[in-house]
């Protein structure tokens, strides 16, 4: 009877644990009713969890019934086995209780995070607007008006930095910073496991493959993004990426001489059948599919940016300000794992240059971009935002020196910057600027230079650049892999973030807007706006898809429309 007394203690403990868990979740349901604006979607998820727990509780009840002392002889082996199962269930129950407690303590909820980021964006957009409008007043009349306008701008700068500092501390309060750190790490590890599983099939001869040739006719940043696009299609169609990089214009030995191979088990493109991309469904019986550049892709699959995986979307929206960039960054992270020699080169360059924090990264693209894809921007335009961000950093950390990592393809710019801004410490390697020139661009030395520039730009506390440049966007993408959420750690002098060949970038109107000029478009809440760009003056430009009208609209009156797609989830990667 003593053995059975011990068993019943376990049973009572299990039932008590599950009862506690049910009560705990039930309490959350009651508290949520105090907030009528809480989304029905979140409520239904909690109810679904509750239903599952009720079912598990019923299963345990039946198991407990089966362990009642029977009339007649006792099968000790069977009873011991059942008790062991119940012990395991108890451990799981305790873990779930702790997880729910942690979520309540640290997870502030998706709506809280969305609101926090909207306040942050609204404050910044207000600042852009006021700067633009008040600067216009300088030219109206008299020195007095100009002096007064300068004072207003100065005061507004203090206000804006105060708001941004408060928001930063809000983002870290009540364990939110620790939660965000852990959640971002968990999501990254999950995605990297899935990619690693896909890229390392047990039998390469039977694996479904997608072939991507790196030699697109463009520079390093563009070629890297080309491979990322291939990788995302491979991931979505459950095909192992085969990267063809021999005679790469930057390194004739191929990708693997610089970065780690994209696969340890499968680099051979051979297969029973081969064909050019004709769509996921049409290619289902083709083992090896060759992918064209994104400009020639037809039909276009749903896996292109700016879409994110459906199964990760809710978690990503909570933890990151731009889920689409985070998703792209995961493929960049996997691709640019350095070979040992490159890792050593980066370490030596870090020491030689004296790269340390706090530091702001500035990327100035000149040469072939100016006059074609981008306008000329003097160094003064960049340094305005550098100074603003150093003043913001000084609110929450000690700024011993105002360091700037300057990356440019204009060798004369470093001297100009040092002359004009002697109170800054410029960190730069002018040999990289020379190697980035048009005549030296496609060499191994140039590749080393652009990799180092991108590395240090991504390591900076803040990035000032032009998003029309692929190098700048790559640095921004890598930056996302180094922090839980670095989506706001930049200022672009021209474009908003985009991925070449992406699907439409849409926003949703949250406030109505009545045009005041012919340049503006009307909006009603819920309208879908196809965004063309942000003018960084409080207004963006786009098309109201319902009305078919293109024009300006206040940036704060919209929010991002998160596009999701049903990507494979690769459960085998967790085994």
From Swiss-Prot:
Pathway: Protein modification; protein glycosylation. A motif (SH3-binding) lies at residues 299-305. Belongs to the glycosyltransferase 23 family. PANTHER family: ALPHA- 1,6 -FUCOSYLTRANSFERASE, ALPHA-(1,6)-FUCOSYLTRANSFERASE. The gene is Fut8. It is found in: Golgi apparatus, Golgi stack membrane. Its main location: Golgi. It comes from the Eukaryota. Residues 1-9 are cytoplasmic. Residues 365-366 are annotated as: Important for donor substrate binding. InterPro entries: Fut8 (IPR015827), Fut8_N_cat (IPR045573), Fut8_SH3 (IPR035653), GT23_dom (IPR027350), SH3-like_dom_sf (IPR036028), SH3_domain (IPR001452). It catalyses: N(4)-{beta-D-GlcNAc-(1->2)-alpha-D-Man-(1->3)-[beta-D-GlcNAc-(1->2)-alpha-D-Man-(1->6)]-beta-D-Man-(1->4)-beta-D-GlcNAc-(1->4)-beta-D-GlcNAc}-L-asparaginyl-[protein] + GDP-beta-L-fucose = an N(4)-{beta-D-GlcNAc-(1->2)-alpha-D-Man-(1->3)-[beta-D-GlcNAc-(1->2)-alpha-D-Man-(1->6)]-beta-D-Man-(1->4)-beta-D-GlcNAc-(1->4)-[alpha-L-Fuc-(1->6)]-beta-D-GlcNAc}-L-asparaginyl-[protein] + GDP + H(+). Residues 502-563 form the SH3 domain. Disulfide bonds join 204-266, 212-230, 218-222, 465-472. This is Alpha-(1,6)-fucosyltransferase. It is a single-pass type II membrane protein. Catalyzes the addition of fucose in alpha 1-6 linkage to the first GlcNAc residue, next to the peptide chains in N-glycans. The modification Phosphoserine is found at residue 278. Residues 31-575 are lumenal. Pfam families: FUT8_N_cat, SH3_9. GO terms for cellular component: Golgi cisterna membrane. Keywords: Disulfide bond, Glycosyltransferase, Golgi apparatus, Membrane, Phosphoprotein, SH3 domain, SH3-binding, Signal-anchor, Transferase, Transmembrane, Transmembrane helix.
């Amino acid at each position: 009877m003593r053995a059975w007394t011990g068993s019943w203690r376990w049973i009572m403990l299990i039932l008590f644990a599950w009862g506690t868990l049910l009560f705990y979740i039930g309490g959350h349901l009651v508290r949520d009713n105090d907030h009528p604006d809480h989304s029905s979607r979140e409520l239904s998820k909690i109810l679904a969890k509750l239903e599952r727990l009720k079912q598990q509780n019923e299963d345990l009840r039946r198991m407990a019934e089966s362990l009642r002392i029977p009339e007649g002889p006792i099968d000790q082996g069977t009873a011991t086995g059942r008790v062991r199962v119940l012990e395991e269930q108890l451990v799981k129950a305790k873990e779930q209780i702790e997880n729910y407690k942690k979520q309540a303590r640290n997870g502030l909820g998706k709506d809280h995070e969305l609101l926090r980021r909207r306040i942050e964006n609204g404050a910044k957009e207000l600042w852009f607007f006021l700067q633009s409008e008040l600067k216009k007043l300088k030219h109206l009349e008299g020195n007095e008006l100009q002096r007064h306008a300068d004072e207003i701008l100065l005061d507004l700068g203090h206000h804006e930095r105060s708001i941004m500092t408060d928001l930063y501390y809000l983002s870290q309060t009540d364990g939110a910073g620790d939660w965000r750190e852990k959640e971002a790490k968990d999501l990254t590890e999950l995605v990297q496991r899935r990619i690693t599983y896909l890229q390392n099939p047990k039998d390469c001869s039977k694996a479904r493959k997608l072939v991507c040739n790196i030699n697109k006719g463009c520079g390093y940043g563009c070629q890297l993004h080309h491979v990322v696009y291939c990788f995302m299609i491979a991931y979505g169609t459950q095909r192992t990426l085969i990267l063809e990089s021999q005679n790469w214009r930057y390194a004739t030995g191929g990708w693997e001489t610089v970065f780690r191979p994209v696969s340890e088990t499968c680099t051979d493109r051979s297969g029973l059948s081969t064909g050019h991309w004709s769509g996921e469904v049409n290619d289902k019986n083709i083992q090896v599919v060759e992918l064209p550049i994104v400009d020639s892709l037809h039909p276009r699959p749903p896996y292109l940016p700016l879409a994110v995986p459906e199964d990760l979307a809710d978690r990503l929206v909570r933890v990151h300000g731009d889920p689409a960039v985070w998703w792209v960054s995961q493929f960049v992270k996997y691709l640019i794992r350095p070979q040992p020699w490159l890792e050593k080169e980066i370490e030596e360059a870090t020491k030689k240059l004296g790269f340390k924090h706090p530091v702001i990264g500035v990327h100035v693209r000149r040469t072939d971009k100016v006059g074609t894809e981008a306008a000329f921007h003097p160094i003064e335009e960049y340094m305005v935002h550098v100074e603003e961000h150093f003043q913001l950093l000084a609110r929450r950390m000690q700024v011993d020196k105002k360091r700037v990592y300057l990356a440019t393809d204009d060798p004369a710019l470093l001297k100009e910057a040092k002359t004009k801004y002697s109170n800054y410490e410029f960190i730069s390697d002018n040999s990289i600027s020379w190697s980035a020139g048009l005549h030296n661009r496609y060499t191994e030395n140039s590749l080393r230079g652009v990799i180092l520039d991108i590395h240090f730009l991504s390591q900076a506390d803040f990035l000032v650049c032009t998003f029309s440049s692929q190098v700048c966007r790559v640095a921004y993408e890598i930056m996302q892999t180094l922090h839980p959420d670095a989506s706001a750690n930049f200022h672009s002098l021209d474009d908003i973030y985009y991925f070449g060949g992406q699907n439409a970038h849409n926003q949703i109107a949250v406030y109505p807007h009545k045009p005041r000029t012919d340049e503006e478009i009307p909006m009603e809440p819920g309208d879908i706006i196809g965004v063309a760009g942000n003018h960084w003056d409080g207004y963006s430009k786009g098309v109201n898809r319902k009305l078919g009208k293109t024009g300006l609209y206040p940036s704060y009156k919209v929010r991002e429309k998160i596009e999701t797609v049903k990507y494979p989830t690769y459960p085998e990667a967790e085994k």
